[in-house]
Amino acid sequence: MYYFYSPEMFVPYQWGLERNVSYAYMPYNSFYYGDYISSLPYALHVPQNYKIQMKEEERGSWTPFSWVEKYAYAFSGPYNKAEVALTFDDGPDLLFTPKILDKLKKHNVKATFFLLGENAEKFPNVVKRIANEGHVIGNHTYNHPNLAKVNEAEYRNQIIKTEEILNRLAGYAPKFIRPPYGEILENQLKWSTEQNFMIVQWSVDTVDWKGVSADTITNNVLGNSFPGSVILQHSTPGGHLQGSVDALDKIIPQLKTKGARFVTLPSMFQTSKERK
């Protein structure tokens, strides 16, 4: 059975679809069609042949539900805890990442940062600051490829190369992976699960990379978050992200007022931040 939560009170109600799962997989901007799920709010392509096995080239951003059940793979956390997780992709940089860290310190909130290996190499001191201030670091590949278009060897290279960089700078090998664009293939999920990684997508997309205002981002998050929400923001070098930074001063206090607790992904999924 699916559960969704009212953003007003964090009260569960039945969404109306039957499925025996322990997590909530009904974020507002994920699309559901037959046995497939898409995490991209701007993915307008709806597969016409979902009743049969879709070919990889036709699937695009659509993920079979079975992957969530078979692998260490999630879009959101447990629905029975009033927890939400802030996550920031594509950093670090010298402009927005420090501003985000300042805001998080101001509100006494810990978050998860999915870093690119090439940016971590450029800005090692920012990586160290993220780790030293108690935030969790995740693996976002080395240079942000579409993983659905790379072979198995290149996928593994992207992950392991980045892991080595982050381990050297942060002091541990991150357990969590987020695939760029939300794109990943089943063989990649299988290998990652076997290697004790966990792949976490998102359930609320702020679309902050478009340079939208703080009010737009705030309304998006407040209107569509529920217990277990994984919120996607960015700390992209050269991005237009001031609205995303400023929105934190509104999102954090208002969600706390609703009863939400801000946690890192290891806390949400009750596992280690480190791949062991």
Model-based region annotation:
Residues V212-D215, Q242-D246, E274-K276:
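Histidine/acidic-residue-rich catalytic or RNA/ligand-binding cores of hydrolases
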Residues M1-L86, D93-K99, K106, K250-P253, ...:
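N-terminal pre-catalytic segment of deacetylase/amide-hydrolase enzymes
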Residues F226-G238, G243-P266:
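Catalytic grooves of carbohydrate-active enzymes
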Residues E56-S61, N151, G239-H240:
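Acidic/histidine-rich helix-loop elements
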Residues L40, K81-V84, L94-F96, K105-G238:
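Metal-dependent polysaccharide deacetylase catalytic core of the NodB/CE4 family, i.e.
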Residues D102-L104, E194-Q195, A247-K250:
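Glycine-rich, phosphate-binding/catalytic loops in enzymes
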